[in-house]
Amino acid sequence: MANGKVIQVIGSVVDVEFSADSMPALFNALEIPRENGKMVLEVQSHVGNNRVKCLSFTPTDGLERGAEVIDTTRPLSVPVGRGTLGRIFNVLGEALDNRGDVKSEKTMPIHRLAPGMDELESSAQVLETGIKVIDLIAPFARGGKIGALGGAGVGKTVLIQELIRNIATEHEGFSVFAGVGERSREGNDLWHEMEDSGVLPKTTMVFGQMNELPAVRLRIALTGLTMAEYFRDEERQDVLLFIDNIYRYTLAGMEVSALLGRMPSAVGYQPTLATEMGALQERIASTKQGSITSFQAVYVPADDYTDPGVVATFGHLDAMIALERSLAEQALYPAVDPLASNSRILDPQVVGEEHYKVARDVQKVLQRYKDLQDVIAILGMEELSEEDKLTVARARRIQRFLTQPMFVSEVFTGRPGQYVSLTETIRGFKEILEGKHDSLPEQAFYMVGTIDDAVAEAKKLSAV
């Protein structure tokens, strides 16, 4: 191992000098011994005169010029394998849950190449989530990438938590959750919820939260992904990878780019935005050994879907769940917009003719209702034709039937969560479209599971 010395410290950026014959490679981890442990840096660039520019994963308070720096000769490596299940880690692979040492003998570097083209495997198998609006309009592909897009406070994290709960309990494989630049409170809540629901023993969690240095938030997704890759490649498992929030990964890259003095690109983003996003997303792949199905929450700043940080994610997704503020304001939860959400596998050859037709007919009715809203606002319902009145009535029932009580929000709403099978979802919407429930009041369809629950709710309402 080569030794160098600190020659400059500016915030979390540390310049280190080595001898000419022992320069560390890019992305190597460097260690600085401290009284209370060690400080870990990552080499970002060679700046000439035998100097390297590094980013620190820990606060640089008290670091002095001349301090000794040790080159570990390899990128940052984290523990992998079954010993990581049920545990919580930071970006360095250190346990955060005060439950003793990690029983894992293997480690893997967080910087790795994506699988080769000859190793990839594409799948068109539907992964049932138990959430009606998703299963009907934007079905998930096993081994695909799914994005939940929305502004602040529209329910991205709740939706991700519900997906974890539903799929982890139904799904036999392992899950990895990466908290990227999100709230520590949400991470704590999620940990306890997973412990209570019994899915924690099959889950590995990594956190790099809002208050951490940009280098941590930039690399935490790679730490989680590396753990998921081990389960896919070595254990030959189908893995679920949850990333909340992928936009914070982009934002951390922007901060790091500014710290390193790179010229900014559009809207202040880093010039390497597409490269960084591609390097992460291309590793989230399904191979002949196993699959990684990823669910990514995507924060949309100021609800602007043209923001370069959001657009950089679009091209990598197989399905897109758009969360709409106007639906959240009407308390239509989950606030998924069925007209803006889509999936690569909503195709009659994959999901079947019946599913495809029901989904498209639901969208057709909702689109017609949207087109008529201006007319209704100005002239009122009375001016509509009988056919349009019927369309509006069914659209309003469909809107309410798309809502669903969540397991993870039971404690707030007082309504028990519902898991609805895909078969029941298709049957319910088909019956509404056929007019079998035109006589039922609209409110009977709100926050229920199956269509039978809506009929039972209507009986309760009529009895009052």
From Swiss-Prot:
This is ATP synthase subunit beta. Its main location: membrane. It is a peripheral membrane protein. Belongs to the ATPase alpha/beta chains family. PROSITE patterns: ATPASE_ALPHA_BETA. InterPro entries: AAA+_ATPase (IPR003593), ATP-synt_VA_C (IPR055190), ATP_synth_F1_bsu (IPR005722), ATPase_a/bsu_AS (IPR020003), ATPase_alpha/beta_chains (IPR050053), ATPase_F1/V1/A1_a/bsu_N (IPR004100), ATPase_F1/V1/A1_a/bsu_N_sf (IPR036121), ATPase_F1/V1/A1_a/bsu_nucl-bd (IPR000194). It is found in: Cell membrane. One of its GO terms (cellular component) is plasma membrane. SMART domains: AAA (SM00382). Transmembrane segments: none annotated.
